C-alpha cells in the first residue's frame, strides 16, 4: 500500500522465494553474482526457465497435501568459488542440464517473452501448467512427507 501510494521502489534480497513472491512485483534470480532470470513474480512461479530458478522453487516447503510428494531438485556438483568462478555458465558445475557448451560459453541474458529474461542455453519451457517438470532429472530425489495424525476426540 505504501509502495503504491508513495511510488516507492525497493530492493529486497532473500533466498526465500516464498517470501519474495508476496513482496515483489518483479523478481531477479542471481547465481554467483550474475542475473540468471528476470520476470514478473507471477511468471517466475508459473514458468521458470533457468535451472537454478527451477531448483530454488522446488525447495520451497509446502503444507499443501497435493504437493507433499512432489519431487525436489537436489543440486549436486561443486559449488564454485565466487573469487574464481568457472568459465562459461557460472551454474554449469551444479546444473542438471549442463552440456559442453555450458562449460565454455557464458549464456547471454535474452528476452524469451516480453519482460521475461533468461541466461541459459536451454530456454525451452521447463514446467507444464500443472507444475510437472518437462525434462529428465537424474539428480532428483523424491521426498515424501506424511500429514500428522490429529488426535481423535477420545484421545483429547
Tell me the role of every PLM-derived stretch.
Residues 1-70:
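P-loop NTP-binding/switch modules centered on Walker-like glycine-rich loops
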Residues 41-150:
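Charged, flexible cofactor/metal-binding loops and thiol motifs
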Residues 150-156:
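Long, low-complexity, intrinsically disordered segments
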